Curated annotation (Swiss-Prot):
Plays an important role in the de novo pathway of purine nucleotide biosynthesis. Catalyzes the first committed step in the biosynthesis of AMP from IMP. It is found in: Cytoplasm. This is Adenylosuccinate synthetase. Keywords: Cytoplasm, GTP-binding, Ligase, Magnesium, Metal-binding, Nucleotide-binding, Purine biosynthesis. Transmembrane segments: none annotated. Belongs to the adenylosuccinate synthetase family. Mg(2+) binds at D13, G40. One of its GO terms (cellular component) is cytoplasm.
Amino acid sequence: MSNIVIVGAQWGDEGKGKIADTLAEKADLVVRYQGGNNAGHTLVVNGKKTFLHLIPSGVLHQHTKCVIGHGVVLDPVALDEEITRLQAKGIAISAENLFVSESCTIITSYHKLLDAVRESNTSEKIGTTGKGIGPAYEDKVSRKGIKFKHLFDKDLLRSRLAISLAEKETLFRDLYKVEYPTLEQEFDKLFALGQKLKQYAADTFSIIDQAIAAGKNVVYEGAQGVLLDVDYGTYPFVTSSNTSVAGVYSGATTAGHGLDHVIGITKAYTTRVGEGPFPTELFDDVGKFIQHKGGEIGVTTGRIRRCGWLDLPLLKYSAKCSNLTSIALTKVDVLSDMDTLKVCIGYKYEGKEIYCAYPGIDLYKVEPILVEMEPFSIDETVTKDNMPAALKTYLKTIENHVGIPISSLAYGPSREQILFFEDYFKKG
């Protein structure tokens, strides 16, 4: 039995889905525990791409059960569309392999509208995906939320909708002056979706608990990345959930269950979507080269990702925030055959050098300490035997500065293009 957590160690888009899909081959459960359909995971199998937003990456493995935990905010429209799209591709999804927590907070049309009008009416852009994630979490915390199970009860759904709409109606009508669905329109849509999706509703807490007790392999699949964590991230340019390992306990299981591995998924360089500080961002042709070669366009938003050198002070900070046990380094192939290769090992900040970021640091004011690395060139298949010495040095530099080992290396889009240095499912 192994309990494995996959955490994004940067600003998201690190390749978590690829690693989760690979580990799902040996997993009994793959569990999403936070975020919503603002996540976007790309899986490449036999040259064919599959895009996932809500459904866990274990869905391509017939024996693996997929769980959406109670920490996820659930857009029933998006879930219904994703299930339909995947089934049309011949991917089996049923009540036998998809389990959605009855306690997931629901994203409504009101949340999505509020998300959009706020972003368009503020001078400080956050770069939200517009999926209604933040407003849904607001309702959850202020106890105005609608749970997945509420969609199955007409009277309860109508009363919860009335509570949710009460304040928003004033905002839409008087402050933002936008049209919005009536309570009855929203009720009809949500109740119909509830009847359609009810078959997937489950007590996921007990499913996970029983799987662990039975010695099953459980993989927890995070969304976004630690640097977008609402508490640990680059606030206010963050998401609205705990993207660190803490989200596993609040969104899926209990702290009583130990974790065997917490894997920090990290690109060999750094990217960011939307606004916010980015110390190693590249504005030259090198940045454009990485962007083009890496296909750095958001799956969820379609926005071009900002690109820069690997930032080790931030990676070390992420490792501490989530108690990472190792790093899975992805997209190494993007850096192959470059003329110039650099890595950030520290910052100059307020008259001194620092080598690990921290919550109070102003990343707009840091000067990255960049060191030149020897460029490397890799083949379509990378093994321990044919790995270039320059790449080995690059990996060792990361390990030495962050203080944890690199346990796997992804060097291409397909399942086969991963080199594992450690068996995550082997005890001891």
